[in-house]
Regions:
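N-terminal interaction/assembly modules
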Residues: 1-97, 103, 109-125
Length: 125
């Protein structure tokens, strides 16, 4: 589990806050690393929609969506970062800030994307 004082953890929280806010204020200027995510939002959202078909984006809780957007972006664009790290980060943030079931939803969607899009079958190895 990431420590709250870990600068990388704090950076991810900051990006998620920006993405969360962006959902409600699309005309606002997105700050820092969140700009990269917003630039690829169409592709990221398409994958989330594809692998969470029972949950249209407008029905996904906004915090869960912000967490997923960052994680999916990282899976697609940050190949030097192991996918397990990306999933662990997202799940821990969902546990810390989301609802009781947020982490399960985030983990399920990310696991499916990893299997179907990245071709990785066994996530536990």
């Amino acid at each position: 589990m990431q420590k709250r004082s870990d600068p990388r953890h704090q950076k991810r929280i900051s990006i998620i806050k920006n993405l969360f806010s962006y959902q409600f204020h699309k005309k606002q200027t997105v700050k820092g690393d969140a700009k990269e995510v917003v630039a690829k939002l169409a592709k990221v959202d398409k994958l989330i929609t594809k692998y969470a078909p029972s949950w249209p984006l407008e029905q996904v809780p906004p915090l869960d969506l912000a967490i997923l957007r960052l994680a999916v972006f990282k899976l697609l664009n940050k190949k030097d970062l192991p996918y397990k790290v990306t999933v662990d980060e997202a799940v821990e943030i969902a546990k810390e800030y989301g609802s009781e079931t947020s982490f399960e939803f985030v983990n399920g969607v990310l696991g499916t994307i990893i299997e179907k899009e990245l071709g990785i079958k066994e996530l536990d190895n």
